[in-house]
Amino acid sequence: MEVKLEEHFNKTFVTENNTAASQNTASPAWEDYRGTENNTSAARNTAFPVWEDYRGSVDDLQYFLIGLYTFVSLLGFMGNLLILMAVMKKRNQKTTVNFLIGNLAFSDILVVLFCSPFTLTSVLLDQWMFGKAMCHIMPFLQCVSVLVSTLILISIAIVRYHMIKHPISNNLTANHGYFLIATVWTLGFAICSPLPVFHSLVELKETFGSALLSSKYLCVESWPSDSYRIAFTISLLLVQYILPLVCLTVSHTSVCRSISCGLSHKENRLEENEMINLTLHPSKKSRDQAKPPSTQKWSYSFIRKHRRRYSKKTACVLPAPAGPSQEKHLTVPENPGSVRSQLSPSSKVIPGVPICFEVKPEESSDAQEMRVKRSLTRIKKRSRSVFYRLTILILVFAVSWMPLHVFHVVTDFNDNLISNRHFKLVYCICHLLGMMSCCLNPILYGFLNNGIKADLRALIHCLHMS
């Protein structure tokens, strides 16, 4: 991600070189050879102040940049490492979303390791000091890590959309997660494959002809033409920013809409239940007037009070004293000398039948209505929380990565729009904003995830105790 710095200076030097050479083309014919040397010297003398202006643009802020990059890198590394450890701790309870979140943490760790130190070193030292092989490998790894992290965000959004839209037929397993991760990494390697080919080292001594720049190299992109470079930049803009932003917005909007529709259905069902209760259950006075006579009721004898809730209890069901018309149906015939004839008159009833049932206290319609309303209030609160969380996810991605992509597009189409003195400072600001997404992803996808939050707390507690 730091190659834009050297590429900008390389193209700036070529522009200054052509300008200086064109200003000295009017030399006489007999001084052609000498004029050629003067043109080269003039070009170098003109471009060297450009290099000095470019090189000293962040000298006053180098300690501040070192501290800021160190803080962002440590925060992103530790946060993603905790998420990765928590997900690996629950590897026996694999879900597709948790599996993707673990891979997101791993890719963000790669972004922190590959992008921060190499970018900061190139900004402060104004040279590439990691060798020719790393010049071909490191830009490729930087691009792959950022692209994979972005594609995993798309995968998480798609999986959540599928789980909300098809909750009953949700059959996503760990194998689907493996397939998604394999697809993401394959796309990342394929899209970033041109970078190892079109990179090369440029020696500053040969460029400026100054002994002060001996043994200093720049790692720059060496595309066959500007059209190739612009096409690659636009393709990265589409894949790394526009496509993920559209997918996140559409998916999360659909999720919020589904939740709000489900909530409205529950409210409508509550209103229907209230109308049914008013129809089937009249007022208290009318219920008292419609009570049956006491001679037609059964008396229930329980072991404990009726107000408490019992799981399984045995009770004896005894008929109430019957009238004269019903006594012949309730009395058991007596035979002389039988056990029945020896019982007392009060015991000459049908024997109690042991039954098992669940006793629940009778709940009034007002209490039931309050309970349902409290449930709806909790659901509304959770719905607002989900809406705010998904909105923050979209805003964090859009705000953190937009400046860097705009910077790349602007510098590819117009190098002179940003001055040499402010070029590195503007680039560092855009790059740090992009790195902030690696620090916020653990919070948004891990610490605010109910499935991982408890494991994170236990893990942090164990680390604190040790």
UniProtKB/Swiss-Prot annotation:
<dbReference type="GO" id="GO:0003214">
    <property type="term" value="P:cardiac left ventricle morphogenesis"/>
</dbReference>
<feature type="region of interest" description="Disordered">
    <location>
        <begin position="323"/>
        <end position="346"/>
    </location>
</feature>
<keyword id="KW-0472">Membrane</keyword>
<keyword id="KW-0675">Receptor</keyword>
<dbReference type="GO" id="GO:0014050">
    <property type="term" value="P:negative regulation of glutamate secretion"/>
</dbReference>
<dbReference type="GO" id="GO:0007268">
    <property type="term" value="P:chemical synaptic transmission"/>
</dbReference>
<dbReference type="GO" id="GO:0060112">
    <property type="term" value="P:generation of ovulation cycle rhythm"/>
</dbReference>
<feature type="topological domain" description="Extracellular">
    <location>
        <begin position="1"/>
        <end position="63"/>
    </location>
</feature>
<keyword id="KW-0297">G-protein coupled receptor</keyword>
<dbReference type="InterPro" id="IPR000276">
    <property type="entry name" value="GPCR_Rhodpsn"/>
</dbReference>
<dbReference type="GO" id="GO:0098982">
    <property type="term" value="C:GABA-ergic synapse"/>
</dbReference>
<dbReference type="GO" id="GO:0032229">
    <property type="term" value="P:negative regulation of synaptic transmission, GABAergic"/>
</dbReference>
<feature type="glycosylation site" description="N-linked (GlcNAc...) asparagine">
    <location>
        <position position="38"/>
    </location>
</feature>
<feature type="transmembrane region" description="Helical; Name=3">
    <location>
        <begin position="139"/>
        <end position="159"/>
    </location>
</feature>
<comment type="function">
    <text>Receptor for neuropeptide Y and peptide YY. The activity of this receptor is mediated by G proteins that inhibit adenylate cyclase activity. Seems to be associated with food intake. Could be involved in feeding disorders.</text>
</comment>
<feature type="disulfide bond">
    <location>
        <begin position="135"/>
        <end position="219"/>
    </location>
</feature>
<feature type="lipid moiety-binding region" description="S-palmitoyl cysteine">
    <location>
        <position position="462"/>
    </location>
</feature>
<feature type="topological domain" description="Extracellular">
    <location>
        <begin position="411"/>
        <end position="427"/>
    </location>
</feature>
<feature type="glycosylation site" description="N-linked (GlcNAc...) asparagine">
    <location>
        <position position="39"/>
    </location>
</feature>
<feature type="topological domain" description="Cytoplasmic">
    <location>
        <begin position="449"/>
        <end position="466"/>
    </location>
</feature>
<feature type="glycosylation site" description="N-linked (GlcNAc...) asparagine">
    <location>
        <position position="17"/>
    </location>
</feature>
<feature type="transmembrane region" description="Helical; Name=6">
    <location>
        <begin position="390"/>
        <end position="410"/>
    </location>
</feature>
<feature type="transmembrane region" description="Helical; Name=1">
    <location>
        <begin position="64"/>
        <end position="84"/>
    </location>
</feature>
<dbReference type="GO" id="GO:0002675">
    <property type="term" value="P:positive regulation of acute inflammatory response"/>
</dbReference>
<dbReference type="Pfam" id="PF00001">
    <property type="entry name" value="7tm_1"/>
</dbReference>
<dbReference type="GO" id="GO:0099538">
    <property type="term" value="P:synaptic signaling via neuropeptide"/>
</dbReference>
<keyword id="KW-1003">Cell membrane</keyword>
<feature type="topological domain" description="Extracellular">
    <location>
        <begin position="120"/>
        <end position="138"/>
    </location>
</feature>
<comment type="similarity">
    <text>Belongs to the G-protein coupled receptor 1 family.</text>
</comment>
<dbReference type="GO" id="GO:0002865">
    <property type="term" value="P:negative regulation of acute inflammatory response to antigenic stimulus"/>
</dbReference>
<feature type="topological domain" description="Cytoplasmic">
    <location>
        <begin position="85"/>
        <end position="98"/>
    </location>
</feature>
<keyword id="KW-0564">Palmitate</keyword>
<dbReference type="GO" id="GO:0070374">
    <property type="term" value="P:positive regulation of ERK1 and ERK2 cascade"/>
</dbReference>
<dbReference type="InterPro" id="IPR000393">
    <property type="entry name" value="NPY5_rcpt"/>
</dbReference>
<feature type="transmembrane region" description="Helical; Name=7">
    <location>
        <begin position="428"/>
        <end position="448"/>
    </location>
</feature>
<dbReference type="GO" id="GO:0001602">
    <property type="term" value="F:pancreatic polypeptide receptor activity"/>
</dbReference>
<dbReference type="GO" id="GO:0016020">
    <property type="term" value="C:membrane"/>
</dbReference>
<dbReference type="GO" id="GO:0001601">
    <property type="term" value="F:peptide YY receptor activity"/>
</dbReference>
<dbReference type="InterPro" id="IPR017452">
    <property type="entry name" value="GPCR_Rhodpsn_7TM"/>
</dbReference>
<dbReference type="GO" id="GO:0003151">
    <property type="term" value="P:outflow tract morphogenesis"/>
</dbReference>
<feature type="topological domain" description="Cytoplasmic">
    <location>
        <begin position="251"/>
        <end position="389"/>
    </location>
</feature>
<protein>
    <recommendedName>
        <fullName>Neuropeptide Y receptor type 5</fullName>
    </recommendedName>
</protein>
